């Protein structure tokens, strides 16, 4: 019996040690788990911040390229009325040949400078395209003049690369 009591006491002490050991192990695991979770959280934040920085750099690069590509847009819009006036002046009757030749040279040099900057005249013949043309008047269409074709150009249109500076103002058969 004394042996049984000693065995029971030893078993109780061993059970208490096992419970204490298990309790000691659990906090260590939870601290390790917490540290791993925090490390994962910091890594996730780092990856997000890195991706955001790359996006900011990419957007800044694209914006810089667009500014460079369309830098002459405002100047071209300011020059286009002068180019229109030169064209009207060349159409006036009674000018001497020397004056017409001088006006034509100025017009050609302006057109050349605009082309070097990527500015092109919008084609205003054939079919009407609402992306490039502005209908300011319509005429009835017939067999000779199909519907949605351009009858006359009142003012030339221009574009800078893929951006419309000014649509061509046209008369359209309807």
Curated annotation (Swiss-Prot):
Q: Where is this chain compositionally biased, Acidic residues type?
A: 9-25
InterPro entries (alphabetical): GrpE (IPR000740), GrpE_coiled_coil (IPR013805), GrpE_head (IPR009012)
Q: Where is the composition biased (Basic and acidic residues)?
A: 26-35
Q: Which CDD domains match?
A: GrpE (cd00446)
Q: Which GO terms describe its molecular function?
A: adenyl-nucleotide exchange factor activity; protein homodimerization activity; protein-folding chaperone binding; unfolded protein binding
Q: Where in the cell is it found?
A: Cytoplasm
Give the UniProt keywords, A-Z. Answer: Chaperone, Cytoplasm, Stress response
One Pfam family this sequence matches: GrpE
**Segments for region (Disordered):** 1-35
Where does it sit, as one GO cellular component term? cytoplasm
Query: Which GO terms of type biological process are on file?
Result: protein folding
PANTHER family hit by this protein: GRPE PROTEIN, GRPE PROTEIN HOMOLOG, MITOCHONDRIAL
User: What is said about its interaction partners and assembly?
Assistant: Homodimer.
Function as written in the Swiss-Prot or TrEMBL entry: Participates actively in the response to hyperosmotic and heat shock by preventing the aggregation of stress-denatured proteins, in association with DnaK and GrpE. It is the nucleotide exchange factor for DnaK and may function as a thermosensor. Unfolded proteins bind initially to DnaJ; upon interaction with the DnaJ-bound protein, DnaK hydrolyzes its bound ATP, resulting in the formation of a stable complex. GrpE releases ADP from DnaK; ATP binding to DnaK triggers the release of the substrate protein, thus completing the reaction cycle.
Family, similarity comment: Belongs to the GrpE family.
The record's annotation in NCBIfam families points to: PRK14140.1, PRK14156.1
Q: Give the protein name, as stated in the record.
A: Protein GrpE
């Amino acid at each position: 019996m004394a042996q049984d009591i000693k065995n029971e006491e030893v078993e109780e002490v061993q059970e208490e040690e096992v419970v204490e050991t298990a309790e000691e192990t659990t906090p260590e695991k939870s601290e390790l788990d917490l540290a791993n979770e925090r490390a994962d959280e910091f890594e996730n934040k780092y990856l997000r911040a890195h991706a955001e920085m790359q996006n900011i750099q990419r957007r800044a690069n694209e914006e810089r390229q667009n500014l460079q590509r369309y830098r002459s847009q405002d100047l071209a819009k300011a020059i286009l009325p002068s180019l229109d006036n030169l064209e009207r002046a060349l159409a006036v009757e009674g000018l001497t040949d020397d004056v017409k030749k001088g006006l034509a040279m100025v017009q050609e040099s302006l057109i050349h400078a605009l082309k070097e900057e990527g500015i092109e005249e919008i084609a205003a013949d054939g079919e009407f395209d609402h992306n490039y043309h502005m209908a300011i008047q319509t005429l009835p269409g017939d067999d000779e003049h199909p519907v949605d074709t351009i009858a006359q150009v009142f003012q030339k249109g221009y574009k800078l690369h893929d951006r419309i500076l000014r649509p061509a103002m046209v008369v359209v058969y309807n």
